[in-house]
């Protein structure tokens, strides 16, 4: 067998393993969702419900969301922001987990969701209606550089902004945009590793941001899954597949606090 053929087989096996893991994560999360009636049982978003078959994004993360541990570092930080920040703005809202959960928790008074996918916006509306927060949530399409013009000034200056837009953060958050958001607390999921010049893009973002904000970082850390009776009959591998958020590498978020 030639080296090229051997390498091809190895790569096919790796892709096959990745596919099998993803498929298993989705199956486990789907099963757990059914058992938990598609309802968050733990954490600050407790009692938030997902409409059946409304998940179009990251379905393998359902279990972590319902257990209140998905992106726990971000979730905990959001819940600790000062109460004067009563507006939540979600860029890359997906199916509304944060947009709706923050309203269900009553941590925020009003929300603004930006989601590029029509299917995503449909899911957000469906889930907002199910959770009876439809009147508190405004839903928009793709977030552009001037997305903040859609937000009343009195809400914008008291806002917390969560940004998860798969690399577009580097094109949207230029110095002018950051200047207009200087009164907000901003959390940015970083995707610099999507780009060959990602380090350069990240350094520029930080350089622009430091004119208006104090910059800190959050990183994915540990989870304790022994506390959930729903997982007591899962084997060790299954529990840790529920814990997995299916990421390509250790995730980092920037937190920007007004100076």
Language model region names:
Residues 77, 180, 208:
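Catalytic-core regions built around general acid/base machinery
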Residues 103-105, 126-128, 175-178, 201-203:
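Short, glycine/charged-enriched secondary-structure capping and boundary segments
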Residues 143, 190, 213, 219-222:
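Residues at the C-termini of beta-strands that transition into short coil/loop
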Residues 133, 176-177, 209:
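Residue-level recognition of alpha-helix termini/interfacial anchor residues
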Residues 1-117, 122-127, 133-138, 149-156, ...:
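S-adenosyl-L-methionine
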Residues 87, 93-95, 138-199:
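Active-site segment flanking the S-adenosylmethionine/decSAM binding pocket
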